[in-house]
Amino acid sequence: RMLDMGFLPDVRKIVDRCPKQRQTMLFSATIPPEIERLAAWVLRNAEKIEIGERRSPAETVTHAFYPVATSQKFHLLIALLERTEFNSVLIFSRTKHGADKIATRLKANNHAVAVLHSNRTQRERIEALEGFKSGKYEVMVATDIAARGIDVEDVTHVINYDVPQHPE
């Protein structure tokens, strides 16, 4: 998660200061391309161990697609939130600026909202995640990179505000 939350430059600095002869272990629930590149750079004689079956999100998720003009996206989002029963909603934005903008507008519409992306401080990220898990926030707006690997119970709806670059 540290890498997902924007600590890659810090990890690189630490690794540069480590001795050449060392044992390095990397554990991850998912291995996106940037983590694979880091692993190839950091690990020597690496052994890859995969546990469990790979499952496609499509096996357990019902999908809906709403073609809408860009100018109407937020109005549709509000309509979906008002007309749908949910425990908690995770909204993905492609950009940090977009996530902030969506969150600000949702707050103006009386929704309890947390924001998660790499421009937030570590303290803000922890508070947002803990608040979302506890139910303090009904909506979490996040970039896809920031939210990778997060495990939150009772998320009833996931909304891709922007079309995702990768279907997972």
What are these regions (language model features)?
Residues 1-168:
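Conserved helicase RecA-like core
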